[in-house]
Design a protein with these regions (language model features):
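Beta1/beta-strand and adjacent pyrophosphate-binding region of the FAD-binding site
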Residues: 2-16
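Glycine-rich FAD pyrophosphate-binding loop
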Residues: 9, 13, 25-44
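N-terminal FAD cofactor-binding segment of flavoenzymes
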Residues: 23, 36-74
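Predominantly flavin-linked oxidoreductase catalytic cores and closely associated redox partners
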Residues: 107-244, 265, 281
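FAD/FMN-dependent oxidoreductases across multiple families
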Residues: 117, 223-299
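N-terminal Rossmann-like dinucleotide/flavin-binding domain of flavoprotein oxidoreductases
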Residues: 56-57, 70, 89, 95-111
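Short beta-strand to alpha-helix junction loop
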Residues: 84-103, 157, 220-229
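Conserved Rossmann-like nucleotide-cofactor binding loop
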Residues: 16, 39, 155
Length: 299
């Protein structure tokens, strides 16, 4: 088995993991960033909505997002639109943004290992985490580290394996399609509330360009047993609410994700193990938005 030594090993190549890896590398630590997928952001699990003020703080380029000036809200019987003179919100190109963050970590000195899935957490005689073993293609690699950062998202892979945390009991489940549309206001997003849309959450239309958008449904668990994927397909097929104004819809890609909704209920430091991002529950419990928190806490 190949054995590698690092000051810091980060598990998870999302926004929290890439940000943590970059900061550690900038502070002259040797850093390994481990990502189980073939490439960063191979699978999209978020709608990518955030605020432009935060984007600018994180120095994310303008070509990584679509700006939003109008905010439309509707229930089955009412709707309202609030407009700004300048764009304040944004819908991220999730893949482009995550890869930008990872490339920045790599440029700072972090070594990225893709297609590398953690299979075992290593402990010393005191039960302290000292590394991980991961399967990478046709071999196993032992990563020894002084500090482990669990940025594995909802799964909390390292912390759960060590017995520090249990599965989240309260969480949101989101399903969405990236779609091509006939008609779309590029700078106007929609949030749809009410039983017709989601019995414990909301539905959305988030434009990503002049003719593409993310249309989705989020449902809180265990508050509702409704499957968001089934509800989403019903809304699109029946063209309910503002979805009807999109005209013909061509489904491009399906996204599905889980996000914890228990607030900052977890301890985030266990000796030399640090939890960041969704692993630590660092998300807005009102609308279940977490990218800006993941980057900030990762840093």
């Amino acid at each position: 088995m190949e054995e590698l030594n690092f000051d810091v090993v980060v598990v998870g190549g999302g926004p929290a993991g890439s940000s943590a890896a970059r900061i550690a590398a900038e502070n002259e630590c040797t850093v390994a960033l481990i990502e189980k997928e073939k490439e960063i952001a191979e699978t999209v699990r978020t709608s990518g909505v955030t605020w432009i003020s935060d984007i600018k703080k994180f120095k994310i380029p303008e070509d990584c997002y679509n700006s939003i000036k109008k905010f439309s809200f509707c229930s089955p019987k009412n709707s309202v639109t609030i407009s700004d003179n300048v764009a304040k919100a944004a819908v991220l190109d999730v893949r482009k943004t995550y890869r930008f963050l990872a490339n920045r970590a790599q440029s700072s000195g972090a070594k990225i290992f893709t297609s590398t899935n953690v299979s075992e957490v290593l402990k010393n005689s005191d039960g302290k985490c000292v590394g991980v073993i991961a399967k990478s293609k046709d071999k196993h690699i032992q990563f020894n580290a002084k500090v482990i950062i669990d940025a594995s998202g909802f799964a909390s892979v390292v912390a759960k394996e060590l017995g520090h945390v249990e599965q989240w009991k309260k969480f949101g489940v989101g399903a969405e399609f990236e779609v091509k549309t006939e008609e779309l206001e590029q700078d106007n997003w929609w949030l749809m509330v009410g039983q017709e849309y989601s019995p414990a959450g909301y539905a959305w239309i988030f434009p990503t360009s002049k003719n593409t958008a993310r249309v989705g449904v989020g449902i809180g668990k265990p508050d509702s047993e409704v499957d968001p994927t089934i509800r989403l397909n019903e809304l699109i097929d029946k063209k309910i609410g503002p979805i009807k104004d999109l005209g013909e819809i061509e489904k491009i890609e399906f996204h599905y994700g889980l996000i914890p909704n228990e607030g900052l209920s977890r301890k985030t430091v266990y000796d030399n193990l640090i939890l960041v991002g969704d692993s630590a529950g660092q998300a807005n419990p009102l609308v279940l938005e977490g990218i800006r928190y993941a980057i900030r806490f990762g840093e």
